[in-house]
From Swiss-Prot:
Protein name: Adenylate kinase
Keyword match Cytoplasm: yes
Gene: adk
Family stated for the protein in its record: Belongs to the adenylate kinase family.
Enzyme class: transferase
UniProt-listed Pfam families: ADK
Major localisation: cytoplasm
Keyword Zinc attached: yes
Region (NMP): 31-60
Binding site for ATP: G11, S12, G13, K14, G15, T16, R128, A199
Swiss-Prot/TrEMBL keywords: ATP-binding, Cytoplasm, Kinase, Metal-binding, Nucleotide biosynthesis, Nucleotide-binding, Transferase, Zinc
Amino acid sequence: MYNVIFLGAPGSGKGTQGEVVAKELKLAHMATGDLFRKAIECGDELGDTVKSYMERGELVPDEITISVVLKHLAGLKDVTGIILDGFPRSLRQAEALDEALVQQGQGIGRVIYINVPEDELVRRLSGRWVCRSCQSPYQSGCAEVTKGKCSRCQGELYQRPDDTPETVKERLKVYFSKTAPLIEYYRSKGKLSEIDGMAEISEVTKRIISAIKCGK
């Protein structure tokens, strides 16, 4: 099974690219955000804990994230490969993933890092809207924001009070402090491909697919 990791800050477009590339290469797309949303929908203690972090715009702690993701991976059947979108986000998560994959006789084939300048990330995130029910994110100007409804669950869209440029910068600072070591971790293993996230969406997709195919 060929496993690919997508790394990129919030607002880098890795979720959109993950869905498109997974469809093109016939790989399963596993977005951590979707797994969290499913946990929230369950309404149990784990889901409530995840929801509290997401509503504050904070990263869900490692141990909770690892449990949610590894449980999902263990249940996957009849897939040729997986795109891991949003996981791992720290060295602790990366090590837990490596250990779990080794136990299954697998590994990571390629790591895609979508690089977008911080000022552009701040611009994108400051214009973000979120579904009040399932936490799906949308960008200002899109059809869903115009209608005020989530296309996934028809929930109400709103802007978080802490999605201001100042607060977004602080969140990105925390994100990069955890992710920078992760990028070097995979670079040292010869697995990392860095993609310019400022290119046209279709061009970014082409470069990602090329990097994945070259890595096989």
